[in-house]
Amino acid sequence: MLSTTMPRSPTQQQPQPNSDASSTSASGSNPGAAIGNGDSAASRSSPKTLNSEPFSTLSPDQIKLTPEEGTEKSGLSTSDKAATGGAPGSGNNLPEGQTMLRQNSTSTINSCLVASPQNSSEHSNSSNVSATVGLTQMVDCDEQSKKNKCSVKDEEAEISSNKAKGQAAGGGCETGSTSSLTVKEEPTDVLGSLVNMKKEERENHSPTMSPVGFGSIGNAQDNSATPVKIERISNDSTTEKKGSSLTMNNDEMSMEGCNQLNPDFINESLNNPAISSILVSGVGPIPGIGVGAGTGNLLTANANGISSGSSNCLDYMQQQNHIFVFSTQLANKGAESVLSGQFQTIIAYHCTQPATKSFLEDFFMKNPLKINKLQRHNSVGMPWIGMGQVGLTPPNPVAKITQQQPHTKTVGLLKPQFNQHENSKRSTVSAPSNSFVDQSDPMGNETELMCWEGGSSNTSRSGQNSRNHVDSISTSSESQAIKILEAAGVDLGQVTKGSDPGLTTENNIVSLQGVKVPDENLTPQQRQHREEQLAKIKKMNQFLFPENENSVGANVSSQITKIPGDLMMGMSGGGGGSIINPTMRQLHMPGNAKSELLSATSSGLSEDVMHPGDVISDMGAVIGCNNNQKTSVQCGSGVGVVTGTTAAGVNVNMHCSSSGAPNGNMMGSSTDMLASFGNTSCNVIGTAPDMSKEVLNQDSRTHSHQGGVAQMEWSKIQHQFFEERLKGGKPRQVTGTVVPQQQTPSGSGGNSLNNQVRPLQGPPPPYHSIQRSASVPIATQSPNPSSPNNLSLPSPRTTAAVMGLPTNSPSMDGTGSLSGSVPQANTSTVQAGTTTVLSANKNCFQADTPSPSNQNRSRNTGSSSVLTHNLSSNPSTPLSHLSPKEFESFGQSSAGDNMKSRRPSPQGQRSPVNSLIEANKDVRFAASSPGFNPHPHMQSNSNSALNAYKMGSTNIQMERQASAQGGSVQFSRRSDNIPLNPNSGNRPPPNKMTQNFDPISSLAQMSQQLTSCVSSMGSPAGTGGMTMMGGPGPSDINIEHGIISGLDGSGIDTINQNNCHSMNVVMNSMGPRMLNPKMCVAGGPNGPPGFNPNSPNGGLRENSIGSGCGSANSSNFQGVVPPGARMMGRMPVNFGSNFNPNIQVKASTPNTIQYMPVRAQNANNNNNNGANNVRMPPSLEFLQRYANPQMGAVGNGSPICPPSASDGTPGMPGLMAGPGAGGMLMNSSGEQHQNKITNNPGASNGINFFQNCNQMSIVDEEGGLPGHDGSMNIGQPSMIRGMRPHAMRPNVMGARMPPVNRQIQFAQSSDGIDCVGDPSSFFTNASCNSAGPHMFGSAQQANQPKTQHIKNIPSGMCQNQSGLAVAQGQIQLHGQGHAQGQSLIGPTNNNLMSTAGSVSATNGVSGINFVGPSSTDLKYAQQYHSFQQQLYATNTRSQQQQHMHQQHQSNMITMPPNLSPNPTFFVNK
């Protein structure tokens, strides 16, 4: 029997004589504690005492688990995650990579469960606590279950039960295994709830502890089959009386603590803590989501819920707390009334209560914004809730939710979420058995169904156990949920029953049937109330889920049908799904491979789920993502999971994004991001699939060498993980993939996601945004803050969440790289595979780790749909999650050709490794990885998001770009416009950037101008995008996503690049800005993508890439958007291939490069303005022309765009190239654009690249991919940003090389912002980009002096990147610094070249050409040179040039002529 000791409530926490209660805080604190998956979090992690203050509500930090206490309970120690327990948000405390819920989440969650310790019995903070507990419950119980649960002393139990009310913790303590939760009341009034989880020795399910509050979640985890039951209910529980009664009380308490939910639970849950769990699920769901592969779904759902939870769910949860937080007395009364038979459900009871009724009824009406939010998330996010299930599930969930949601008023989302979560748990539990093993089990079925359509996806995995437990718990929980819904007036019979096959059994389920008290049994008042409620609910459903209203059932059913695999995939990404989110989560998984495995399937997921606190956001973001696409449910929390398909999309998730991402932190940190990300994700998702495919492809491309092997490895890993997971009792279809994620050292992890994604893969492609690639996603979806479209943008938080997801991307990093960084990444724990993903998270800048989330967010936000998601999600887990197929399909769609073409091995691409690893390889993200620390990052928000971004960023993004073609990815937020404002630097990187940016000032101005220009340029991003990228580089980073969107191939790449470093970095601080990246969106798939209306750039992809607008905006997230908006506005204007108009660079104003002047001055320091000020593109023309020659070569696929370019979709890719201005330009359809970009790149390059490290990479990727010189050329600017990615994508590298060069130029900015954070870091950035840097470095060589910076980068983020192996040279560069730089460049080139092989060479040459026009147009070259000098005023142009030259010559030798961005070079030329 596993006894999970939850951390005490803060007050409780104070060691108390009755340490038994060390778990005391189980309920309140628990959530946090449980948050970690059940690995020995308690003892290991838990022991890490979280400092907790006596707090009525358990704040994550408040919760503290005394090591002794933790260890006291064998279960606790067993459940690693639980240990983190109290530290959900604040907890960070997971010691061994334990995931902790993000504080946001936790806090939210905490409320409910925690119910203030002091008045735990009386005061329920909110249902959140339960959720938290649920998270806690997630704790894996494998071994734990074996251990005897520490039985709470009878007295304690009694006390606990008494106190339990106050806390929901007591309630759903049970997880997969029946566990009884004993809460004991401490003298301090601190509830100590000792959750004795006893693992029911079930044949299939591995004992998984749900977070305390989640009865089901635990089940959901590995063993779908092992629903947690309160001892009373538990079949095997030895908790027995104590536990049982205690549990029951707790349940009751929980119910009360959590309010109706709890009461409902009590009602139902007395028998089923599950409901309690569900309640917890609301918040916990995320955790719940984490709970098992099935949970993956759940995770997805939960994550989604949470994700949105972070933005939506979480916020909503908080709202729910308010909504559902009734006085304890009221809750008790409700529970009593239910128990006494007066009411069938607590909700029913509450519905009859005027105050409650009014509150619930009026809640949404009074909070239209909330409804909108709900709606927003619904469309994108609501499904989150469902999404948890899977993208698909969401529909049903949505329907359910719809049904529930209205009723949510009463129970509110919370309930639905809980239900979903519960169901998800169940689903998760069952999910493993996709078939809805529990179908026969009405309860299980119902639960799944009800909460999520996911029910069907429930599955067999848990199969029998799941069924049993699910029956008990599920039934209970589900019935409770149903009851709640029914009480809410939702006609579950109709919806639930109708929609889910399982639901049909619902009729057979007494509890379910009993949910609705017959009207005849109601008093007239009650009846009236019910009618009113039903009407309101109906209204709500119509309002929120118009499409799901009645068709939900059908939709869900149909989707469920397809969802299962998908769902599984998406959902858990298999376990991965969750993981995916986790991917980023993986990060937490990261905590331990095992965790991941567990996590993926069960505990790992749980753990992930836990992370969700952090990750939740990310996850949420990702989830949002998933949401978007049904299939993309990949997005589904899965986010990773879903990301599978959407992985990229979810990813997008991202992410990561991405859907993230991935991770929650974004959510947590930047909830808004999350939301927006989620939205974006959704969009992305559509794209994502393509993206993911693309990404994968690109990845493959990038890792073409790995292609075949990767594929094989991927398969092996996948199988291996899958098997392990199954063995682990965490069976999940996706699990395998998920696990692979973990396992896969490089991209495998990410890829594992892919596997999961695979199912999604099918739909995504169709969905993929190829069509919408630039225009739709970008235009529509672009998260341009200014534009409503920015679904992606919706909420930075969301984005963040998504990003978080994406964060995992970094995992992609590549095991090696990751590994190295992993430690820093924290992901390391995740495992190579996961870690890899996480590594990506590492991204360029670890320092930014904190920011990553934001970046992720950005990325997510950037969602850019595809890119971001893919990136996000892919980058994080999402990418990984994408199944190779997914990738293919994803990449394929749009970039598929490119990708495929570019990517040597489709399979390779597909192989998770490729995309994931590749991206990681691209590592520019790797650096992020360090930040990755899954949970930390998630928590910190920085890494995850970043990672997600990063993760496959380059590759993924690139792929995505190709695939999403940008459009969708476009969304990506130019996370960092910050570079724009050097000082804006949301974070150090920006500062660094700033540092760099003396020049940066210029750059910033330029960026803004460029942004403006870019917008203008925006023509395809042509220059604009690039410019954006460049200027906004930082933004761009976000934009990466955006880029992705527009770029699609290129854009994505760029985005990645951006994302990777800058973005991440930016993202971290700029996360919101990153959103801007929507502007990224700009970029659209093609040049127009640049226009990417959405993108802040507006069209601009350049913008997008450029971040440009974003850039300007970048500094403030909003800014980002605005730029997008402005960008968008101007974007069109810029569109013309010739948008050089304003951009003209005059020799007289080289500094401004006129394009800067044109737009710059306004935008100058104004990130927002910059974006805003349209300012016609300065004379980018010269850049254009300058770039044109190369452009010509790369014309089609902006070097950056390579994906596109390589595809021949120069425009799109151009966008990508956009990342660097050049790349973007390249992207522009016309050469002109490209040229502009090229020109721009030169000019804006620095800027673009500023943020772009990754972007560069992307560009590189693209450039490299296609091998476009142009690409490279453009890439150069792009490279600056994308360099790393390019480097990462050596295959593509060739083109990338130039981008690299560009990157280097850009690097400075980029680095500052992103990579190294060294202003000087151009190189750093480049370095980050690694291959790119030097390549770019040459170009950027002027910055070369910054080589040192590069060095810095290497240390921090670049290293990772290089780790990606993007270009080992890059790494070298990082490591070596100047000398290295060149060498790096060389290596970079080599890598690029080698990776790209011929591409490299070709690209390299072309890349060199990138500078191309330089020889052709000396005048231009000179102008450009001046411009650059001015741009990088800080460094002596000469110096920079020299360095650049040197590097170019030495590294760029391949691409020396054009490649060297060096103005001098140009001039010389």
Swiss-Prot record:
Residues 17-34, 116-130, 731-745, 782-796 have a biased composition (Low complexity). It is found in: Nucleus. The modification Phosphoserine is found at residues 9, 206, 210, 883, 905, 911. Keywords: Developmental protein, Nucleus, Phosphoprotein, Segmentation polarity protein, Wnt signaling pathway. Changing residue 514 to E: In allele lgs-21L. GO terms for molecular function: transcription coactivator activity. Its main location: nucleus. Residues 511-555 are annotated as: ARM-binding. The modification Phosphothreonine is found at residues 11, 208. Residues 1-16, 40-60, 90-113, 422-438, 455-474, 770-781, 806-830, 844-880, 904-913 have a biased composition (Polar residues). The keyword Phosphoprotein applies. GO terms for cellular component: beta-catenin-TCF complex; cytosol; nucleoplasm; nucleus. Involved in signal transduction through the Wnt pathway. Binds to ARM and PYGO. PANTHER family: PROTEIN BCL9 HOMOLOG, PYGOPUS. Belongs to the BCL9 family. This is Protein BCL9 homolog. It comes from Drosophila melanogaster. The lineage of its organism: Eukaryota, Metazoa, Ecdysozoa, Arthropoda, Hexapoda. The gene is lgs.
